């Protein structure tokens, strides 16, 4: 029965063409999902593809683990060491790529620190530069405080009632800390293109 249905599908030229187009679209979507991950080598050269994803994962796995105060301080030390040896120079593309190649292993943790010490709903790429080793351990506590401060500001006025504010603060306070870090670039790329791939398959 199944064999008959398959033969029926491929018996018409229009069906064969449609299947070829569908297959090509699926291959292209999978290709973009794979090449969406980039890795910068020690010479500051960009790479994409499976090998790049593997190399980037290797870099990030060095920092896999619980992000407690000690781990966050190590990230801060590493970032400052990189800044001293490979400083960002305005207009110097090569120097900046070398800097990024050294930072890519800790980039997500660095961004987490930036977000944790910025005002709520704000982001400052260089906020980490002014965070001290004593402060960085208060990352999780600080994100709750920043939400509380924002909810009491004029920016949030009229957006939430008191019950909703209390609910948001409660949910933020329930975050299981410290967080556990591991590389998720592969999953992020798959999820980014998952909708397109599922639509094509269906």
Task: Please annotate each region the language model reported.
Residues 1-22:
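Aromatic- and glycine-rich beta-strand/loop motifs that create alpha-glucan
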Residues 6, 76, 148-151:
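Non-transmembrane alpha-helical segments in soluble domains
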Residues 26, 30-101:
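Juxtamembrane non-transmembrane segments of integral membrane proteins
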Residues 20-28, 198-201:
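Lipid-exposed faces of alpha-helical membrane segments in multi-pass integral membrane proteins
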Residues 78-143:
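Extracytoplasmic loops/domains of multi-pass membrane proteins
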Residues 121-201:
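Membrane-proximal, non-transmembrane alpha-helical segments
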């Amino acid at each position: 029965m199944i064999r008959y249905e398959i033969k029926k599908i491929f018996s018409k030229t229009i069906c064969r063409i449609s299947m070829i187009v569908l297959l090509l679209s699926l291959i292209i979507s999978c290709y973009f999902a794979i090449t969406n991950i980039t890795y910068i080598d020690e010479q500051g050269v960009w790479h994409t593809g499976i090998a790049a994803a593997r190399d980037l994962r290797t870099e990030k796995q060095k920092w896999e683990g619980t992000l407690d105060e000690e781990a966050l301080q190590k990230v801060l030390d590493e970032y400052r060491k990189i800044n001293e040896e490979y400083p960002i120079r305005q207009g110097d593309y090569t120097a900046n790529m070398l800097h990024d190649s050294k930072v890519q292993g800790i980039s997500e943790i660095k961004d987490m620190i930036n977000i944790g010490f910025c005002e709520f709903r704000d982001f400052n790429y260089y906020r980490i530069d002014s965070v001290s080793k004593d402060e960085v351990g208060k990352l999780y506590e600080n994100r709750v405080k920043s939400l509380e401060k924002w909810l009491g500001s004029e920016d949030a006025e009229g957006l939430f009632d008191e019950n909703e504010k209390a609910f948001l603060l409660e949910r933020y306070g329930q975050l299981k800390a410290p967080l556990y870090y591991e590389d998720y670039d592969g999953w992020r790329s798959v999820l980014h293109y998952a909708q397109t791939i599922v639509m094509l398959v269906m």
